[in-house]
Amino acid sequence: DSEMWREMGFEWRERVRKVYVVVCFFLYLYMIMPNTSRRSKILPYLKRDYAHRGLHDSSRLIPENSMPAFREAVKQNLAIELDIHLTRDGKVVVFHDESLKRICNAEGTVEGSTFDALQHLHLSGTSEHMPLFSDVLRYVNGRVPLLIELKLPDSNMKLCPAAWDILKDYKGPYMVQSFNSLGIRWFHKHAPQVLRGQLSSALTRTNPENPFLARFCVQFLLTNLICRPDFISYKLADAGNPS
């Protein structure tokens, strides 16, 4: 009898273990599931070629994320990917890096500088200056789609309402995206009509300045639970991630 009970106990534990694995699997799928209800609205964007940070060309003195780069992209009928930051005095500017060193050969950060101070800097040794986001929108004027990356160092969410205050009157096609899921969550809550995307890659191997848990959750798309992105943009080299 005791042997029979032991066997029954073993079989029961095995069943519980299998149920646990299945439940965890479906729970994970639920957590990483994007919003699929607007897939038809995403499709037109997938059919376009994109000028990453505008159609820049150092040999022609056209820096990345500059007005000439955006003019060239529009001229070639290319969709535009660009990046936005918030300055210390609340201006939304188009720039990729947090640091000013690589492009402007200057110390400091965009977030730590006023817009007037940034206008004294030049982009990649040219005569071009960091453009205002509103000026870029005014120029593009809906002629090509925009893919706008929210740059949110230190998870300062002030950029989100500032960007939305500019975007809410823009009539052209655009989507927003970010590595920071809190920024995507802000749009999910406050401007749900905006198409939004989660950027990700093998973040646990990079960006040590950010908390490991946050990088882990974004890498494995666990933060989709709080922001329900309409699309996921994953670094191609890291596409082996099981999520």
Model feature map: region roles:
Residues 3-243:
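Phosphate-group recognition and catalysis centered on beta-loop-alpha active-site segments
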